[in-house]
Each structure stands twice: as structure tokens, then as C-alpha cells.
């Protein structure tokens, strides 16, 4: 049974109904419809914390999806799941792939910065200040990208950049 039919949440049900109506009336190919259905089911599973099911749906959505913009959001969501699972190397890979297809995805840049900053903090705890600085410099670059796209957002990152002398 498609996930859209088992959601218990009123908003999720309403969104699913609207999405199904749009799929019927907007001219789309069968591949686009299939990709969207898997993507929608992946988002639903992800919102419920069912990450394995969400990943399965996202990977299935990637098969028929050819639009780079749409693929970027699938890749971004896969990155989110890997981040949640503590798989930071995989997460960075998926965020990077998302940005390759859609460079106007500030949340991917922000998440990459957060991971790099975290790794910098880990390096400090391990006593390696040189490695920490390299991670912090990389975090700064990703945050600058995110801020350039959405100047009013990421205030904490802007403050960190200013405090550490990395804001230009």
C-alpha cells in the first residue's frame, strides 16, 4: 500500500490528496509521476523517522527522475538522513551532489558547513589544531555560499564568521 494512503496525520492526508490531484491534472510523464510518488513517500517516511524506508523510496525516485533540480532535492534529503544517522562522509557526498545539480540550495551548503564545523570541533578535542583550522576554513566557505544565497538567514553562522575573522 502506498505510504500516501496510510498517513494518519490530517495535514499529510490533505497534502497527499492535493498531490494526487495535481499528478492527474498537470501534464507529466509516467516517469515523473513515478519519481514524485517515491519522493513523496520518502518524505513521509522521513518525517516519521523511518529512515530505511525513506532511503529506499528516495533511491527509487532517483531512477526515473531526470530533472536536475528535482534530483537535487532527492539527493539533499538522502544527505539529511545520513546526517541524522551520523554518517557524515556519506552526507557530505550527497549534499555535494545536490549542489552540483542545483547550486541555489543554501540548506545543503549550510549542512555541509555544520558537518565541517563539527569535524573541526572534534579535531580540537583530539588536540589537532591544524586539522581543526582546515575544517573550520571549509565550514566558513560553505557558510559564505549559503549566506550569499539567503543573506537574512544563518545569523549564527554569520556571527561565527565575524567572531573568527572569516567574514569578508
Curated annotation (Swiss-Prot):
The keyword Secreted does not apply. Keywords: Chloroplast, Membrane, Photosynthesis, Plastid, Repeat, Thylakoid, TPR repeat. It is found in: Plastid, Chloroplast thylakoid membrane. One of its GO terms (biological process) is photosynthesis. GO terms for cellular component: chloroplast thylakoid membrane. It is a peripheral membrane protein. It comes from the Eukaryota. The keyword Aminoacyl-tRNA synthetase does not apply. TPR repeats lie at residues 35-68, 72-105, 120-153. Its main location: plastid. HAMAP family: Ycf3 (MF_00439). Essential for the assembly of the photosystem I (PSI) complex. May act as a chaperone-like factor to guide the assembly of the PSI subunits. Belongs to the Ycf3 family. PANTHER family: CELLULOSE SYNTHASE OPERON PROTEIN C, TPR REPEAT-CONTAINING PROTEIN MJ0263. This is Photosystem I assembly protein Ycf3. The lineage of its organism: Eukaryota, Viridiplantae, Streptophyta, Embryophyta, Tracheophyta. The gene is ycf3.
Amino acid at each position: 500500500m502506498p505510504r500516501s494512503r496510510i498517513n494518519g496525520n490530517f495535514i499529510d492526508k490533505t497534502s497527499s490528496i492535493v498531490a494526487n490531484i495535481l499528478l492527474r491534472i498537470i501534464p507529466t510523464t509516467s516517469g515523473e509521476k513515478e519519481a514524485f510518488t517515491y519522493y513523496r513517500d520518502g518524505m513521509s517516511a522521513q518525517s516519521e523517522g523511518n529512515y530505511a524506508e525513506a532511503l529506499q523510496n528516495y533511491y527509487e525516485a532517483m531512477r526515473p527522475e531526470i530533472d536536475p533540480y528535482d534530483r537535487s532535492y532527492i539527493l539533499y534529503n538522502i544527505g539529511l538522513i545520513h546526517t541524522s544517522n551520523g554518517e557524515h562522509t556519506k552526507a557530505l557526498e550527497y549534499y555535494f551532489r545536490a549542489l552540483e545539480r542545483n547550486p541555489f540550495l543554501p540548506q545543503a551548503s549550510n549542512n555541509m558547513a555544520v558537518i565541517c564545523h563539527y569535524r573541526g570541533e572534534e579535531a580540537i578535542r583530539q588536540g589537532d589544531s591544524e586539522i581543526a583550522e582546515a575544517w573550520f576554513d571549509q565550514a566558513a566557505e560553505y557558510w559564505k555560499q549559503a549566506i550569499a544565497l539567503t543573506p537574512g538567514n544563518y545569523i549564527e553562522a554569520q556571527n561565527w564568521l565575524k567572531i573568527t575573522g572569516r567574514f569578508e
